[in-house]
Curated annotation (Swiss-Prot):
One of its GO terms (cellular component) is cytoplasm. It comes from Drosophila melanogaster. This is PCI domain-containing protein 2 homolog. PCI domain is required for interaction with polysomes but not the interaction with sbr. Signal peptide: none annotated. Pfam families: PCI. Keywords: Cytoplasm, Cytoskeleton, Membrane, mRNA transport, Nucleus, Protein transport, Translation regulation, Transport, Ubl conjugation. It is found in: Nucleus; Cytoplasm; Nucleus membrane; Cytoplasm, Cytoskeleton. Required for the export of nuclear mRNAs and involved in mRNA trafficking in the cytoplasm. Component of the nuclear pore complex (NPC)-associated TREX-2/AMEX complex (anchoring and mRNA export complex) which functions in docking export-competent ribonucleoprotein particles (mRNPs) to the nuclear entrance of the nuclear pore complex (nuclear basket), thereby enabling the export of mRNAs to the cytoplasm through the nuclear pores. SMART domains: PAM. Component of the nuclear pore complex (NPC)-associated TREX-2/AMEX complex (anchoring and mRNA export complex), composed of e(y)2, xmas and PCID2. Interaction between the TREX-2/AMEX complex and the ORC complex is required for ORC localization to mRNPs, and consequently mRNA export. Within the TREX-2/AMEX-ORC complex, interacts with Orc3 and Orc4. Interacts with sbr/NXF1. Interacts with Moe. Interacts with nudC; required to maintain stability in the cytoplasm. Mono- and poly-ubiquitinated. Residues 208-389 form the PCI domain.
């Protein structure tokens, strides 16, 4: 593609003159076919580029050609390529500032920031000598510089405002912050989107990604109702053809809804190959604590990698609650012997649980609002409320 570097630079120039942000983004993309053109692998392209382009676009293109050069080395110079991509991002910031009342270059910004994140991830994987997450955090700083320019654009009309680029960048930053486990940095970004008058004008794919990450953050903050709201939006609006994305959303939505008392349907879990949750739901419904523990133990790595291990562990309280409710139904009394709960635990396979541990489990269930009542230690009994002693768990 483009044959010579002159043809390539001529194409970049025409895209800029036509205010064609999409084409310009393609010329600067590391995923476009032009990256395979050996004629573009130039270590010092500045003089050549300056003949075609004016600042700061010339800096963006020069840095891009240097990225291609470093990636073509054997082995690839990921760190050098990242450094040049970071320089390209800085030049894009200056370009955004130069184009005061225009937003046609937003696709270019998206592409440069996306490739910066990809290169940062490559550095984290292939390079040594720095703290894990360091390069990604530096990349986030560069992307944040673009975000600030977009967020500060209050002079343009709705059609030309750079604020329409905010959500794309926020999603890029979310992906970094979740990867390096710095979720607290998401809060000001969420506030910025909430306060943006164009928050309903962002493209639907961006809104789906945004709701997915905000839902996950709400989940980690134990704000489960909000998590269900955001994740449900993401799942409902994600097209069916993106089955892998819908499955990813369900990995978080299903356990959160289970924690709120909603059990998933077998057909849904079969469709998205998530039968792990069906096994958990069946054990939970039956109050089979031992079986629940077995499933969690067998799937521990999967749950940890998905970031839902602790959330699934919280479901265990509902398993206890369901088991002890069965004792209440059988005994048909509001004064229940603690020994009956111990026997129930032994019956489902927890043979090493003591009476003292049973007291602790029941006390935690009372504290958590899953049982309405109190423990009479003098009589070794649980006295439950005559009205709704085992409150339903729901929204």
């Amino acid at each position: 593609m483009f044959g010579t570097v002159n043809n390539y630079l001529s194409g970049v120039l025409h895209a800029a003159q036509d205010l064609d942000g999409e084409s310009l983004a393609t010329y600067l993309s590391l995923r476009d076919v032009h990256v395979q053109n050996h004629n573009l692998y130039i270590a010092q392209p500045e003089k050549l580029v300056d003949r075609f382009l004016k600042p700061p676009l010339d800096e963006v293109v020069s840095a891009h050609l240097k990225v291609l050069y470093h990636l073509a080395q054997e082995p690839p110079g990921y760190m050098e390529a990242y450094t040049q991509q970071s320089a390209a991002c800085g030049a894009v910031v200056r370009l955004l500032q130069q184009l005061k009342d225009e937003n046609w270059c937003l696709p270019l910004m998206y592409r440069v920031c996306l490739d910066l994140r990809y290169l940062a991830q490559a550095c984290e994987k292939h390079c040594q000598g720095f703290t894990p997450g360091h390069v990604l955090e530096k990349a986030a700083d560069c992307i944040m510089a673009c975000f600030r320019v977009c967020a500060a654009d209050g002079r343009a009309s709705e059609e030309d405002t750079k604020r329409l680029g905010m959500m794309n960048l926020v999603n890029q930053l979310f992906k970094i912050y979740f990867r390096i486990n710095k979720l607290h940095l998401c809060k000001p970004l969420i506030r910025a989107i909430d306060n943006c008058i164009f928050k309903d004008s962002f493209p639907l794919p961006e809104q789906i990604t945004y709701k997915y990450f905000v839902g996950r953050r709400a989940m980690f903050d134990s704000n489960y109702q909000a998590a269900v709201q955001y994740l449900s939006y993401a799942f409902s609006n994600c097209p069916d053809r993106f089955a892998s994305n819908k499955r990813l959303i369900l990995i978080y939505l299903v356990p959160v809804k289970m924690l709120l008392g909603y059990l998933p349907s077998k057909s849904l879990l079969q469709r998205y190959d998530l039968l792990l949750f069906l096994d958990l739901a069946m054990a939970m419904k039956a109050g089979n604590v031992n079986r629940f523990d077995e499933i969690v133990r067998d799937q521990e790595l999967v749950l940890i990698r998905s970031g839902i291990y602790l959330l699934v562990e919280k479901l265990k309280f509902l398993v206890y609650r369901n088991l002890f409710k069965k004792v209440f139904v059988i005994r048909k009394s509001h004064q229940l012997d603690m020994g009956d709960f111990l026997s129930a635990l032994h019956f489902v396979g927890l043979t090493d649980v003591s009476l003292d541990e049973t007291h602790c489990i029941v006390a935690n269930l009372i504290y958590d609002g899953k049982i309405k009542g109190y423990i009479s230690h003098a009589h070794n009994k649980l006295v439950v409320s005559k009205q709704n002693p085992f409150p339903s768990v729901s929204l």
